[in-house]
């Protein structure tokens, strides 16, 4: 019964919107920030998203990725709507969840080890604690 309660609590936390965030760019700025991402790293694809949530994962620590030397921060993006994915992994209208943040640029470019997520419009930000994250993995 305890496991069901933990899952229910996790689902409640995941469904809550979180606090308003002023990150994100305007629709008419998308091309400007795609170009900015390409200046940072020409080999990474851009995934343009809206209706997004920034999740701060309250975990003890994420280590540097020893293979790439990248620092990872305990944050991910979950978006309910993909506008465009330059890599062709997702269709317009799909939802997506990123891997962990490696860098955040210009208030709207969420960089992971292999992708730039361009946050369009306003979104929300919330925290999930380590115990709830572990419960999700069960």
Question: Residue spans of the language-model regions?
Answer:
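N-terminal non-globular leader segments, chiefly Sec-dependent signal peptides
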Residues: 1-104, 122-138
